[in-house]
């Protein structure tokens, strides 16, 4: 058979992993890659290619990076394709582009739809304490993440998982599912299944304000919040005007009479903070203007900017 011609749209590492799988499939030809423009990163604000762009260049694939994908319609329309495949592209793809492929435009989405439509499904699954999440391969339609899905597979969320780990696990699952099912979709062997609109929930992009830790919450919710934002963008808290980033905590069984947010102990193990119903112990913390470090350094190195009795806001 002729190779399946794919236009791929994606930006971060999970998209790069899906693109890598497509380039390795003998029955697939990636005819175009579309990614977000390069962005300045780091303190020097140097332009860095997206992970998807790096894979495209490595495989000598044609790539475009429009500020708005709608402005690239004419260029995309000139390229014959069977599928548009997207994964974490980061822009709405207009209907006139979705209608270009001969077969379909499909999305590799990081949730068990209709749960968590939107841009942060992995973060929301962890934040809400879900025990499972998964990948849905779905038809792309004008309405965000509302298309029928061809197939879903679930995966457990372990207590040791954070968003970074789940991105890696879901990328591997998505790779497997694309490899096993793209030809089936091409051959019309997977009838699409409508989403149950009564069960729809959303996962909007997380704002900077929503990254702030609410110490006046249950310990389990504080723990889930922090691991949902690890290793990026990282949860934060304030002591006065100083912002501290907290990347990892564990739940303690201790409880004392103290205002939520209060530092109740500093030991070789970490920094213990009172919550609404108990305590969590900070394991990884970043002081303003410094690098992330183990919280045990406060005791071991006699650091003085935090002390027992101080209270995070």
From Swiss-Prot:
<comment type="similarity">
    <text>Belongs to the Fmt family.</text>
</comment>
<dbReference type="Pfam" id="PF02911">
    <property type="entry name" value="Formyl_trans_C"/>
</dbReference>
<keyword id="KW-0808">Transferase</keyword>
<dbReference type="InterPro" id="IPR001555">
    <property type="entry name" value="GART_AS"/>
</dbReference>
<protein>
    <recommendedName>
        <fullName>Methionyl-tRNA formyltransferase</fullName>
        <ecNumber>2.1.2.9</ecNumber>
    </recommendedName>
</protein>
<comment type="function">
    <text>Attaches a formyl group to the free amino group of methionyl-tRNA(fMet). The formyl group appears to play a dual role in the initiator identity of N-formylmethionyl-tRNA by promoting its recognition by IF2 and preventing the misappropriation of this tRNA by the elongation apparatus.</text>
</comment>
<dbReference type="Pfam" id="PF00551">
    <property type="entry name" value="Formyl_trans_N"/>
</dbReference>
<dbReference type="InterPro" id="IPR011034">
    <property type="entry name" value="Formyl_transferase-like_C_sf"/>
</dbReference>
<dbReference type="InterPro" id="IPR044135">
    <property type="entry name" value="Met-tRNA-FMT_C"/>
</dbReference>
<dbReference type="InterPro" id="IPR005793">
    <property type="entry name" value="Formyl_trans_C"/>
</dbReference>
<dbReference type="InterPro" id="IPR005794">
    <property type="entry name" value="Fmt"/>
</dbReference>
<dbReference type="GO" id="GO:0004479">
    <property type="term" value="F:methionyl-tRNA formyltransferase activity"/>
</dbReference>
<dbReference type="InterPro" id="IPR002376">
    <property type="entry name" value="Formyl_transf_N"/>
</dbReference>
<dbReference type="InterPro" id="IPR036477">
    <property type="entry name" value="Formyl_transf_N_sf"/>
</dbReference>
<dbReference type="InterPro" id="IPR041711">
    <property type="entry name" value="Met-tRNA-FMT_N"/>
</dbReference>
<keyword id="KW-0648">Protein biosynthesis</keyword>
<dbReference type="GO" id="GO:0005829">
    <property type="term" value="C:cytosol"/>
</dbReference>
<feature type="binding site">
    <location>
        <begin position="111"/>
        <end position="114"/>
    </location>
    <ligand>
        <name>(6S)-5,6,7,8-tetrahydrofolate</name>
    </ligand>
</feature>
């Amino acid at each position: 058979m002729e190779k399946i011609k794919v236009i791929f749209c994606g930006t971060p590492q999970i998209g790069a992993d899906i693109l890598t799988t497509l380039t390795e499939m003998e029955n697939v030809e990636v005819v175009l890659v579309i990614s977000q423009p390069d962005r300045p990163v780091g303190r020097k604000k140097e332009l860095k290619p997206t992970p998807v762009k790096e894979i495209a260049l490595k495989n000598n694939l044609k790539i475009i990076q429009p500020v708005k994908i709608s402005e690239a319609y004419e260029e995309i329309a000139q390229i014959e394709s069977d599928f548009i495949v997207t994964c974490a592209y980061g822009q709405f793809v207009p209907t006139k582009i979705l209608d270009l492929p001969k077969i379909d435009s499909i999305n590799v989405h990081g949730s068990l739809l209709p749960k968590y439509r939107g841009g942060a499904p992995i973060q929301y699954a962890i934040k809400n304490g879900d025990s499972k999440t998964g990948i849905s391969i779905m038809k792309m339609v004008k309405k965000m993440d509302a298309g029928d899905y061809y197939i879903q597979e679930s995966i457990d969320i372990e207590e040791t998982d954070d968003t970074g780990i789940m991105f890696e696990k879901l990328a591997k699952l998505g790779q497997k599912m694309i490899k096993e099912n793209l030809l089936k979709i091409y051959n019309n062997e997977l009838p699409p299944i409508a989403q149950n609109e009564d069960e729809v929930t959303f996962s909007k992009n997380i704002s900077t304000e929503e990254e702030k830790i609410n110490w006046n919450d249950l310990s389990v919710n504080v723990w889930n919040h922090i691991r949902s934002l690890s290793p990026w963008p990282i949860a934060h808290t304030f002591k006065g005007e100083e912002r501290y980033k907290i990347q990892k905590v564990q739940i303690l069984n201790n409880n004392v009479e103290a205002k939520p947010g209060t530092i109740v102990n500093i030991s070789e193990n970490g920094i213990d903070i009172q919550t609404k119903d108990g305590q969590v112990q900070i394991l990884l913390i970043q002081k303003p203007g410094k690098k992330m470090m183990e919280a045990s350094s406060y005791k071991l190195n006699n650091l003085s900017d935090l002390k027992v009795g101080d209270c995070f806001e």
